[in-house]
Amino acid sequence: MVSQNYLVFVSAARQLCGVEAFSRLLARHFGARAETHVLDADMPGLVRALEGRDAVVFNFPIVGWKRQLFTPGLAAVLARLMGRDVVVFLHEWLALDWKRRIVLAPVVLCATRLAFSAPEIADEFARTRFARLVTRRRQVVPIPPNVLPVGAEKASDISRALSVQRQGGRLLLGQFGSIYPKKQSAIVLQVAAELVRQGHDVGVVFAGSFIKGLDNVEENFFASVRDLGLADRVTVTGYVAGDDELAAIFKEIDVFCYLFPEGLTSRRGSVLAAALSGHAVVVNAPLEANALGHHGLFQRLIETHAIRLVPTEADIPTVAAAVLAARQEPPEPLDAEAEIAKLWHSICEGIDA
């Protein structure tokens, strides 16, 4: 195993998407062997930054690079011309807009190593014709949570308002992460509506913000809220910058709930972050039995009942029943710090391999 020195590309964005959060955490866990570099059009600056570095690392898609059309490809070509390895992490592929895949194609062609966020992404990439043209050095890398448990909590107006609801006996159903159609956030509203129909006092907390640039996402979401009669029961926090503020919000949530079109996959860092908060997460099972086989932390969280799987195609009443059961049975204790450290060790070791 060769230990390389890395230059990890990031954006200048202040609000980080999950993929960029992973990029920055990756550089941090490599310690002195990695530096971050804001990807921009300053190629002379990149030449200087590459001094003493053996490889560059790209992660896609990063929201902060949406307007970068040629810069990623130029940076990858420059790195190869300077004799550096090019490591490319693909957290999505076919789910990306075809125009975005065209922009990324030159970078992937330059890659000396490809890493995928989940077996499903690796498989869908391998089935494309484009895959025949690129490196065969490919691996699946377990993606860690993008938000880590913190000991300190910082109360905010939002967390205080949630605390008042909870003290009044309301069950708070939660979801963490960006709100967008493929996450099926609106289905969680249906679960809440079913619980209300059964006579339970339920609120829903979305700890995150709507992804900008997607047409009518916010409007359609709030239309669903109104149609289901949940207008006075839904809280959308917007982007929460501080982990301590987020921890205070998480503290007030009774049960997290996710229902994905493809079931749970190992790239769902938001599910990991929610499960590590100490509250149970109800989520539909993966389509493939081995989807989480490479990810030790997901397996541990399922073993301790922090993650409670319902059938992949579970109907709303089944999920609602699972939420009520999870509220009554807290997860078993887990040494989150040790498990996360073990996961990062395996990630860094895998990239060096």
Regions found by a protein language model. Name each.
Residues 112-160:
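Donor nucleotide-sugar binding/catalytic pocket of nucleotide-sugar-dependent glycosyltransferases
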Residues 248-265:
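Acidic donor-binding loop of glycosyltransferase active sites
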Residues 162-183, 189-192, 205:
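Conserved donor-binding/catalytic core segment of Leloir-type glycosyltransferases
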Residues 310-352:
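A charged, aromatic-enriched C-terminal amphipathic alpha-helix characteristic of glycosyltransferases
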Residues 108, 239-240, 247-253:
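Short alpha-helical donor nucleotide-sugar binding micro-motif in glycosyltransferases
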Residues 203-219, 239:
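Glycosyltransferase donor-sugar binding loop
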Residues 218-240, 307-309:
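Nucleotide-activated donor-binding/catalytic signature segment of Leloir-type glycosyltransferases, i.e.
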